[in-house]
C-alpha cells in the first residue's frame, strides 16, 4: 500500500519538461480597422488611406503661382474692368482662384452671353498672349475712340471703360459704316470679345451714333450673328438706364473674323491667344494666398498627400486623391493585437488555439518561445514573416496604385436658366460619389478580412510544421505549445525552428519516457480504486457502530422497547 501511495505522489508531483510554443507578435498599438465581419478590430500595424487634413491656404501648384482674381470675377478680368487693371499683366498661372462674392465684373450693366461656357473654356487655359487685335490709334480713323467712357466703370474717381474693349462713337457728326477683319496667324485659338450697346432712348442713340436704326454683324467660319440694338427705358443699374451685352468667340488658327456695323459696336481692342494646360482650373474660395507649394489644391486649402482618397472637398486641381464621403479608410498590414483570435474569418484557416500575442517577440510577426534547462527565449520565424511582409506590402501598393488616379475635378458651369440641368448634374455626381465611396469602403473591408485571415493561416501553418516534425516525441498541451518527451537543448530547439529536427534521434528516449508516464497513470488508477473501496467500507462500519450505540442508549432509558417473540 505504501508503495502505491508513493507512486501516486510521484505522478502528482510537477516536473519541468522542455516546451516549445508557436505564437505571434503583439505590441501596444491602438490602431483599429474594420472588416466585413467585425468593427474596430485592434491590430499591430495599419496604414491610413484617407487624407483628411489641409493647410487652409492657396498655394503654388508645382511651383507655379495661381491667378488670384481678388475682388474681380472672370468677367471683370477678361473684359478689363478698370478695377481689375492689375490683373492685365498676368500671362500664366497654375489655376484661377475666384472669391464667392467678387464685386468687380461687368461694370456697365448688361448680359454676358454664354458666360458659363466661357468660364469652362478658361478653366483649361494655363497661359495666354494678350495682344492688340485692332490697334486703337490706327484701326478706327473715322470714329471717336476717346469719349466712350462711363461713370459706371469709374476708376480713381474718374469715368473710364474696359481695358480690352473700345466704345466707338460718332466723329465730326457722322458714324460711317465700318468693316474690319482679323486673320488668326497665331497657331493657337484666339479669344475675341466685343459688345453691343442698347441705349435707353432714341436721343441717346442719335447723339452717339447719328442714326436711329443700326446693326452689328460678326462673322467667322464657326460664328455668324447679326445684332440689332434694342432701344428702351430700363431701370437704372449703377446709374445707367442703357445696357451693354457682351459676346465672345474662339477663332481657330488660320480663320478670319469680320466685324461690320453702322453703330452701337463695342469693338475688340485686345484679344487672347490661348495655351491650354490639363492641370488648370477655376476654384471658388475664400482662402488666402500663402508662400507654399502643393500638388493638389482644393477650395478649403492645399493637400500634400500621396494617399489614394480624401474627404476634404469634391473639387480639386492638380494631382489629387479621389474624393469619397468616408470618415475612415484604414488598411491592416499587421496582425490582430491582443486579445486573441476567436472567430473564423471569411477566407482562411484560423489560429484560434492561441490565446494571445507576445510583446516580447519584436523581430518578426510569427515565431517561437522555448523553455529548457538552458533557459527560455523568443525567436521570430524570419522566412514566414518576410514572405508575409512581401505579400502584404505588394498588395497595399497595388491597391494604392490602382485607386490612386490623380486628377483634377472642378465644378461644371451652369447659368440661371439651366437650374434643372444643374440639379440633374448634381444628382448624377452624387450617384457616382456614392458608388466611389461604396467601392472604396468595400475594398478596404475585404482586404482587411483577407489580411487578418492570411496571418491566422500563417500561424496555423507554422504550428502544423512543428507538429509534423515532432510527431509522438512531444504532446500538445494547448495554447499553441508542445511538451517534449525528451530533453531538448538549445541545439535541439533550433533544429525544430529551422525544420531540421531529427525525429529518430530522440524517438527512443521519448518512447521510454512516454511508457513511464503511461505506467504511472495505470498505477495511479489502481491506487485510486483501492482508496475508493477502503473509504466505502470504513464509512459503512462507522455508520453501523453509530446506530448500535444510539439503540443501546435508548433501550437503557426506556425510550426504546425491544420485544422478542418466540
UniProtKB/Swiss-Prot annotation:
Listed A to Z, the keywords are: Clathrin- and caveolin-independent endocytosis of virus by host, Clathrin-mediated endocytosis of virus by host, Disulfide bond, Fusion of virus membrane with host endosomal membrane, Fusion of virus membrane with host membrane, Glycoprotein, Hemagglutinin, Host cell membrane, Host membrane, Host-virus interaction, Lipoprotein, Membrane, Palmitate, Signal, Transmembrane, Transmembrane helix, Viral attachment to host cell, Viral envelope protein, Viral penetration into host cytoplasm, Virion, Virus endocytosis by host, Virus entry into host cell
- Which parts of the sequence are marked as the site Cleavage? 344-345
The signal peptide here is: 1-17
**Posttranslational modification:** Palmitoylated.
- Which species is this record about? Influenza A virus (strain A/Hickox/1940 H1N1)
**Which residue spans belong to the Extracellular compartment?**
18-529
Glycosylated residues (UniProt): 27-28, 40, 104, 179, 286, 304, 498
Q: Please give the Gene Ontology molecular function terms for this protein.
A: host cell surface receptor binding
Lipid positions (S-palmitoyl cysteine): 555, 562, 565
Q: In which family does this protein belong, per the annotation?
A: Belongs to the influenza viruses hemagglutinin family.
Those parts of the protein on the Cytoplasmic side are: 551-566
- Where does the protein end up? Virion membrane; Host apical cell membrane
Q: Give a short account of what the protein does.
A: Binds to sialic acid-containing receptors on the cell surface, bringing about the attachment of the virus particle to the cell. This attachment induces virion internalization either through clathrin-dependent endocytosis or through clathrin- and caveolin-independent pathway. Plays a major role in the determination of host range restriction and virulence. Class I viral fusion protein. Responsible for penetration of the virus into the cell cytoplasm by mediating the fusion of the membrane of the endocytosed virus particle with the endosomal membrane.
Note the InterPro entries from the entry: Capsid_hemagglutn, Hemagglutn_HA1_a/b_dom_sf, Hemagglutn_influenz_A, Hemagglutn_influenz_A/B
Q: What else is known?
A: Major glycoprotein, comprises over 80% of the envelope proteins present in virus particle.
Q: Name one GO cellular component term.
A: host cell plasma membrane
Tagged with keyword Plastid: no
What's one Pfam family here?
Answer: Hemagglutinin
Protein name, entry field = Hemagglutinin
Could you tell me the membrane topology recorded for this protein? Answer: Single-pass type I membrane protein
> Keyword Membrane, does the record have it?
yes
Disulfide linkages recorded for this protein, renumbered to the chain, are 21-481, 59-292, 72-84, 107-153, 296-320, 488-492
Single biological process term from Gene Ontology: clathrin-dependent endocytosis of virus by host cell
Q: What is its main location?
A: virion
Report which superkingdom the organism of origin falls in. Answer: Viruses
